[in-house]
């Protein structure tokens, strides 16, 4: 991939990925590295600027996170945000202490002096704070450029060395002029150009794939979802003669999904599709398994075995292509001070001894960028904007052991949910919608009889890239219709609940 324009060093903030997304939206290619990335790793990317993210630690604490001091000797512009701001102050000799006046939420930013970072933004603008420490004094060579009610050094800089620091979070939507501030840093302080777009990405990625693959053949695993469909379309665009597209029915799909996948690829994409029914194999291996991580790893391992068996039927198949996204990489790895959230079946769930080399064309981009790429490649809107569906399928939407009976119940409930959302016009307004079969029975009354049956949870969320999400504020009448239909039409369910958790702290999927 191309060199990074901006590198974000991640100190564990829940907003780190937003920084990269906001800059990419402005055409500036941005990557995230761990806070303790080696200097050689940073130099290899040849960035034009660095951003130090926020984080949960305190710079004066024993467990504080510090980057390699050499980052300050690279002669690159640096922007510190929240923890990153305090780290800059601390590194250059200022005092950072706990504050009695913590700032969480909205605050007003008052300008003190003119500067390139805040140029053409509004004095008195609303900014988003989230800190319990304060900078007591400025290091030598720095000047205050803005204050807030409780932060006398809310923004400061050393313009000569192009080091800037903000106590607030410009990357979050609540910061009124945040996008403009990040743009000022990237374009006017770092001299980045707006060259990042999906058209350029497709051209660069095609050249990389052609060079990597040569005369070998590629097995492309598809599920019918957005990610794998875009991968298949991209590969068909550049190595169609060497491409084998395989769809595996693992028995964990939604109602009629296998038929829809076949129609999508043959009729809409014009790609020959090999369909394999491996449902008995998958369900047999998942029998008795209740741990979600074990489910994911069994599914990942079994997928690879099926693909390897299929590859033996064809000559020269050396590569496996799949729709791994940047979000999958982030959630499946330790980034900065963050912990692994969960293994994705196509990241942490893959066996180490598999015989394929991997091709993951989308692993550097976010979900919203995948949709733009799909549009660039000519895919239809109904395919590009369909809701995400996880690789492990319904296995991670059934808590506890997976059985054919539970799958049947969940499929029926899921059909009703999607039907009601589409008929009411809400389906395309939401990011993702699905049912979760809880491993919980509850007492109910139907007619004059006591029931003791399954509870189903409805999960509907709004998001732009899947890194963060909030629950959808569906109308009560719609929720009532969904609940009534599921209870009346699906045997074995007597209770429906609605998940009102956001991400974070919850993930979108339950497992």
From Swiss-Prot:
Coiled-coil spans in chain: none
Keyword Amino-acid biosynthesis: no
Name of the protein in its database record: GMP synthase [glutamine-hydrolyzing]
Organism: Campylobacter hominis (strain ATCC BAA-381 / DSM 21671 / CCUG 45161 / LMG 19568 / NCTC 13146 / CH001A)
Pfam families, per the entry: GATase, GMP_synt_C, NAD_synthase
Residues that coordinate or bind ATP: 223-229
GO molecular function: ATP binding; GMP synthase activity
Native organism taxonomy: Bacteria, Pseudomonadati, Campylobacterota, Epsilonproteobacteria, Campylobacterales
Assembly information from the UniProt record: Homodimer.
Its biological purpose: Catalyzes the synthesis of GMP from XMP.
Residue numbers annotated as active site: 82 (nucleophile), 169, 171
Keyword terms, alphabetized: ATP-binding, Glutamine amidotransferase, GMP biosynthesis, Ligase, Nucleotide-binding, Purine biosynthesis
